[in-house]
């Protein structure tokens, strides 16, 4: 199993690479690419960790060598948020980065499962899809927007608010991956009830959690460590699905035939072909139904921005 991380010298990329080096199945290969010249050194550093995962690093303008034979490609390349920026401010820089990297994926590893981490995910996934379509290799079951950070935040915040063991808390998060498009389905959590005020407060905190980290780091970065953990969890789930493990389910932002938008985050079953099945997200509360309906114009505009960028 070969996993490639594009953007591996960044804050998310290095955290993700460390976690993958320690958690990928024995015999796996981990390929690190970044434009930054430090990248081969990151690979050497990681290679000293005693796990049976071979690590190689590649730097420069061309990621082709890193992508050859990749089963999974995780893209975290781009600039991070700074105070005062929202995810859409990142579009002007990160859109071109994602386009160029996905063009290389299309040429070098067209069958790989591609997980997009680079923000704004609502838009960058649409960009990736259009690039793959232009190259004639688009398979909607092999492209994912990684929204796992919204899931782990939801689980963490709910457990803290209710005094629960976080390992026992499971939350589906639907919609997109920025602001009001992030919708945790708190009404579905088994054995837990919330007041209307708690639901509103938790939902808002989950939606604004990225800003919470950006402000707390005071200009020194964004959510890199928690995002690295979230991306590792999702990447390992992709690998487990590829290896034939049954019942691997994660929420992801996919082209899954949603009635709501061309791309929509919801639970999916992962397998040997990527998405094996898109699962219905089930019954929602009145609050959640209203929030879902209210987000759709924003989500669709984000998607259209990505489509138009490639055209």
From Swiss-Prot:
Pfam families: Ldh_1_C, Ldh_1_N. NAD(+) binds at residues 7-13, 34, 94, 117-119, 227. The active site is at 177 (proton acceptor). InterPro entries: L-lactate/malate_DH, Lactate/malate_DH_C, Lactate/malate_DH_N, Lactate_DH/Glyco_Ohase_4_C, Malate_DH_AS, Malate_DH_type1, Malate_DH_type1_bac, NAD(P)-bd_dom_sf. Gene3D superfamilies: Lactate dehydrogenase/glycoside hydrolase, family 4, C-terminal, NAD(P)-binding Rossmann-like Domain. Keywords: NAD, Oxidoreductase, Tricarboxylic acid cycle. Its EC number is 1.1.1.37. Belongs to the LDH/MDH superfamily. MDH type 1 family. This is Malate dehydrogenase. It comes from Shewanella piezotolerans (strain WP3 / JCM 13877).
């Amino acid at each position: 199993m070969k996993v490639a991380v594009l953007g591996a010298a960044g804050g998310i990329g290095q955290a993700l690479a460390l976690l993958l080096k320690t958690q990928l199945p024995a015999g796996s290969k981990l390929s690190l690419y970044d434009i930054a010249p430090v990248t081969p050194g990151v690979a050497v550093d990681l290679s000293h960790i005693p796990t049976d995962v071979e690590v190689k690093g590649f730097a420069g303008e061309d990621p082709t060598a890193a992508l050859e034979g990749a089963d999974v490609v995780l893209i975290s390349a781009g600039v991070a948020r700074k105070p005062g920026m929202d995810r859409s401010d990142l579009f002007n820089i990160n859109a071109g980065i994602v386009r160029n990297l996905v063009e290389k994926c299309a040429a070098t590893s067209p069958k790989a499962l591609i997980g997009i981490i680079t923000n704004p995910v609502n838009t960058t996934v649409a960009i990736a899809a259009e690039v793959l379509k232009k190259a004639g290799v688009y398979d909607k079951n092999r492209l994912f927007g990684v929204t796992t950070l919204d899931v782990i935040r939801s689980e963490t915040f709910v457990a803290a608010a209710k005094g629960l063991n976080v390992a026992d808390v499971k939350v589906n998060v639907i919609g997109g991956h920025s602001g009001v498009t992030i919708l945790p389905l708190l009404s579905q959590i088994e054995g837990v009830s919330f007041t209307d005020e708690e639901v509103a407060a938790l939902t808002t905190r989950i939606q604004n959690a990225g800003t919470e980290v950006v402000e707390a780091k005071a200009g020194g970065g964004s959510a890199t460590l928690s995002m690295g953990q979230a991306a590792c969890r999702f990447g390992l789930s992709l690998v487990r699905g590829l290896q034939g493990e049954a019942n691997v389910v994660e929420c992801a932002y996919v082209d899954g035939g949603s009635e709501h938008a061309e791309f929509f985050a919801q639970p999916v079953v992962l397998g040997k072909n990527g998405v094996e099945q898109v699962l219905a997200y089930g019954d929602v509360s009145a609050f959640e139904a209203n929030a879902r309906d209210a987000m759709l114009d924003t989500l669709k505009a984000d998607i259209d921005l990505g489509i138009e960028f490639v055209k």
